[in-house]
Amino acid sequence: YTPVHPRRKRLTLLEPDEIAAGANRVRLRSENANRDVALIYVLFCTGAKPIEIARLEVRDYLNSDGSIRERSEMRPETAVNGRSRPLFFTSSRACAAVDAYLVERRRRKLGVAVPASGFDVYRGLDPSSALFLTEGGWPFEIGGRGPNDQRETCRLMIATLRSIFKRAGWTGVTAQSARRVVARR
């Protein structure tokens, strides 16, 4: 008798050019292309968990003058472990993708600032609005995992990322494997 060893899952690691090619496929196949491409790049740029990405706010990405916060901070209330940590927006592709998405948001008047606060700060967006919104213009809903497990999750963000990975043509890629790519760099 020879025991059969279960197949180990092959770790899917994407190179920067594969990420860019996948982002281009998403741009062609998605109804919310700017947001979806920005989500890809923010995931691979920051290594944040899906729930943390759902909790990011405009002020985490932008300074009040509208410039990008290249060295930001994952606020304690955003981080899963409740501790702040550095958050870097230094990838030119990631910043270009998020900027294109924010231009679209302002054009569609999603999460814009009230006129009294002025349209010249935070590029006219409400600094406390979620950085990423659903197709309907709402923040991604965060809730408990179940009746016996009160830890928080963001099912819609996870489903959105799965859908994006499928559109990108990436098999075996998950948010967790994307985070491993960041950890290995």
What is the role of each PLM region?
Residues 1-185:
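Conserved catalytic core of the tyrosine transesterase superfamily
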